[in-house]
Design a protein with these regions (language model features):
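Domain-scale signature associated with acetyltransferase and cell-envelope carbohydrate enzymes
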Residues: 1-126, 147-148, 166, 182, ...
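Beta-rich strand-turn-strand
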Residues: 106-109, 156-169, 174-178
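ABC-type ATPase nucleotide-binding domain
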Residues: 122, 153, 171
Length: 202
């Protein structure tokens, strides 16, 4: 069961950001979690968004959600474990399907990041759709799309412009810089094809 402090924070948070929230879903979190949501940001919640799914609140690691001006989250029913660090910059959009993301993840959304349904994503995962800084006079910002039923191992990083096809598997420790074909296994730095026509089950 969640602690009383966490339950109180859930109620207060959903009341405080009621003008930002559209739909029937709610924000779930623990007592130490930190939210900074601009008044023009929008959370379109068809289902619940669990920022910290540690119901006992014993891990001591808070989750952070920052949404800058005119940013949007569209969510079906998505769960983070503890230690989530999610930032949406101005005018960006994060689309979350019915999936699960383990502890200590980082999401940096400058433009568009999509995570589909039925994904299982391990701990220490990072995804970013921008280089964040200029290099040789340019700043690369391109959408990232993670399809449905994707298995992502621990300590994987996915960089801007990548599309991960449905049913794909990404091995632990990989850095993904190019598209991943559906139902393929990739791994390495940078990630390369290891096997095609793979099938996996939870």
């Amino acid at each position: 069961m969640r602690t009383l402090k966490s339950l109180v924070k859930i109620i207060c948070t959903n009341v405080r950001y009621r003008n930002n929230i559209q739909g029937r879903g709610k924000i779930g979190l623990c007592s130490g979690d930190c939210l900074k949501i601009d008044r023009t940001a929008k959370l379109a919640l068809k289902g619940n968004l669990h920022l910290n799914n540690d119901k006992d609140g014993n891990n001591g690691r808070s989750s952070i959600l920052r949404m800058d001006a005119n940013s949007t989250i569209e969510c079906q029913n998505f769960s983070f474990t503890y230690g989530a660090d999610v930032i949406l910059f101005k005018n960006s959009k994060l689309v979350l399907g019915n999936s699960y993301l383990n502890s200590n993840c980082k999401i940096r959304c400058h433009n568009l990041i999509t995570i589909g349904d039925g994904c299982v994503i391990s701990h220490d995962f990072t995804v970013m759709d921008s280089d964040a800084h200029e290099l040789d006079g340019s700043r690369n910002t391109n959408p990232v799309h993670i399809g449905n039923h994707v298995w992502i191992g621990t300590r994987v990083t996915i960089l801007n412009g990548v599309t991960v096809g449905d049913g794909a598997v990404i091995a632990a420790g990989s850095v993904v810089t190019k598209d991943v074909a559906p139902n393929s296994l990739v791994g390495g730095v940078p990630a390369k094809m290891i096997k095609s026509k793979v099938e996996w089950k939870v």
